[in-house]
Amino acid sequence: GRQLDYFINSGKPYIGYFIVFGTSLVMAIIDTVLLCTMKEKPSLSPAKLNLASLAMPLRDTKYRGFILVLIIWSFTIGLGTPFLPVHLLRNLQLSHTFITAMGIASAVAAMLGTWLWGRMADRYSWQKVFQNAGLVVAAGYICWGFVSKETAVFAAPVIMCAVEGCNGAFNTASLNLQYFESPQSGKTVYLGVTSALANISSVLAVMAGTLITTLLSPIIGEATFNVLLTSSGILCVAVLMTYRLLYKHSHANIR
């Protein structure tokens, strides 16, 4: 972050961006090599799968409702998340150094949050974690809509740490609930299809968010990002309410 600010202020932004890109590329290659060297335990009962198997999660009436909740959640989160860095830099005028520092702090908050939410899951249920962590994430997005240049230095780190401290726990709870809802045989298909559809939903959300910002920017200017982020948070609350209506009792004791 500091080197990026230095090169931008020196009128050589592309050097800073190239350093960031090069570092990220090297780390990605190392990560790929390490993943490829990991040993997997062979499956004791290999399943025979075909293209028709990919439709199994959608045909399963028990699982279909939950996969729909996750698809809509991915869409609502995808509406605002990709535009947050632009909002931080352009509208709130925070430096790359400050944003990087927030990223480090939020990573620490994520580790601490995972431990705290894990204890909550052990004591209560993954449903409680899914709902409560999701509410904090939604509240964070709603709060982004009310952060101004004057309050950004104080409010932005708090919101980012709160959201990241709950985001990992929400995803872990989601995975455990998917595991519970899917049948004993074919869990890989269920989880894989869910992940794929959620990612497709996120891509569509980015396209929708881009269209919204294009239409609203000439009308309300910088407030476009505030509206987009707040709307994303409100929609997240609606998704969580829908989940509660569908699975209030069936997920109550999953640990």
Roles of regions detected by a PLM:
Residues 169-183:
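Intracellular juxtamembrane helix-capping segments at the cytosolic ends
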Residues 4, 113-126, 213:
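Helix-to-loop junctions at the C-terminal end of transmembrane segments
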Residues 82-99:
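Short amphipathic helix-loop junctions that connect adjacent transmembrane helices
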Residues 40-68, 255:
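Juxtamembrane intracellular "pre-TM" segments in multi-pass secondary transporters
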Residues 153-170:
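Hydrophobic core of transmembrane alpha-helices in multi-pass small-molecule transporters
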Residues 27-38, 230-255:
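Multi-pass alpha-helical transporter architecture, strongest
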Residues 4-26, 213-234:
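A membrane-interface helix-boundary motif in multi-pass transporters
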